[in-house]
Curated annotation (Swiss-Prot):
This is Dicarboxylate carrier UCP2. Solcar repeats lie at residues 11-106, 114-203, 212-297. PANTHER family: MITOCHONDRIAL DICARBOXYLATE CARRIER-RELATED (PTHR45618). Residues 1-16, 104-119, 200-217, 295-309 are mitochondrial intermembrane. It catalyses: L-aspartate(out) + phosphate(in) + H(+)(in) = L-aspartate(in) + phosphate(out) + H(+)(out); oxaloacetate(out) + phosphate(in) + H(+)(in) = oxaloacetate(in) + phosphate(out) + H(+)(out); (S)-malate(out) + phosphate(in) + H(+)(in) = (S)-malate(in) + phosphate(out) + H(+)(out); malonate(out) + phosphate(in) + H(+)(in) = malonate(in) + phosphate(out) + H(+)(out). The chain crosses the membrane at residues 17-40, 78-103, 120-145, 174-199, 218-242, 269-294. It is a multi-pass membrane protein.
Length: 309
């Protein structure tokens, strides 16, 4: 057995809720530069046609993007928006991941056997609910990641300033800008991520290929990250463009997607795919492995407190 040993008592809803938020914050701290690189690649060329965008592209890959940002803006630019990102994960991951098992049990009416339908429903439900709670933090995070460009003024001076400025200039609706594509994205992401992780892990355990420990969690998380990136990238690009857009640039998320298709072609929907995969793959591995270990550690601590001798 690698890592903490599973306890006889299943983790409580509170343990899952706190464990998911904490694990997601740890994963964000490690993978945030990849997420920032992804955002820069996704918004690149949105005001130009495909030919001009390709010719004038400032960023040409994950490593190039990161190195260019460090050279022109300093290393701290890779973590621009981190505070909002951590706020987002504590409110967002706690709901969409921490409540997944509870909602899944609700749809199966307490049955131990969960079919693909109940898993998909649970993933969609917690993904959409998490967006309703955490959307303002996501808007601020994306704005910060996109703003720090050489030669242009900073739109926001701090996280608090960003919340205040967006609310003042765009109204409170500005803080929930992009909610529709984000609901769609996170329903898709949650289904792909959590359901794929669930299915891969169950298959590995049932086939006796692995035991329920770190290697199993690592393999399941990596597979879930790849599947999620392939499925969710188009919606993710539209979400990023729309949330970062100036007031009146796009009338809706659908208009944003149509404009991208007309000006940049279908490949625009997979802009930033490699950093998305590197980020989601590594994020999933760190998050799920940490989450599984945190659940066991917290339950072991609770058990030892209740029975110290």
């Amino acid at each position: 057995m690698v890592g903490f040993k599973a306890t006889d008592v299943p983790p409580t809803a509170t343990v899952k809720f706190l464990g998911a938020g904490t694990a997601a914050c740890i994963a964000d701290l490690i993978t945030f530069p990849l997420d920032t690189a992804k955002v820069r690649l996704q918004i690149q060329g949105e005001r130009q046609g495909p030919v001009r965008a390709a010719a004038s592209a400032q960023y040409r890959g994950v490593l190039c993007t990161i190195l260019t940002m460090v050279r022109t803006e300093g290393p701290r630019s890779l973590y621009s928006g981190l505070v909002a990102g951590l706020q987002r994960q504590m409110s967002f991951a706690s709901v969409r991941i921490g409540l997944y098992d509870s909602v899944k049990q609700f749809y199966t009416k307490g049955s131990e056997h969960a079919g693909i339908g109940s898993r998909l429903l649970a993933g969609s439900t917690t993904g959409a609910l998490a967006v309703a709670v955490a959307q303002p933090t996501d808007v601020v995070k994306v704005r910060f990641q996109a703003q720090a460009r050489a030669g242009s003024g900073r739109r926001y001076q701090s996280t608090v300033d960003a919340y205040k400025t967006i609310a003042r200039e765009e109204g409170f609706r500005g803080l929930w800008k992009g909610t529709s594509p984000n609901v769609a994205r996170n329903a898709i992401v949650n289904c792909a991520e959590l359901v794929t992780y669930d299915l891969i892990k169950d298959a590995l355990l049932k086939a006796n290929l692995m035991t329920d420990d770190l290697p199993c969690h690592f393999t399941s998380a990596f597979g879930a990250g790849f599947c999620t990136t392939v499925i969710a990238s188009p919606v993710d690009v539209v979400k990023t463009r729309y949330m970062n857009s100036a007031l009146g640039q796009y009338s809706s998320a659908g208009h944003c997607a149509l404009t991208m298709l007309q000006k940049e072609g279908p490949r625009a929907f997979y802009k930033g795919f490699m950093p998305s995969f590197l980020r989601l793959g590594s994020w999933n591995v760190v998050m799920f492995v940490t989450y599984e270990q945190l659940k066991r550690a917290l339950m072991a601590a609770c058990t030892s407190r209740e029975a110290p001798f």
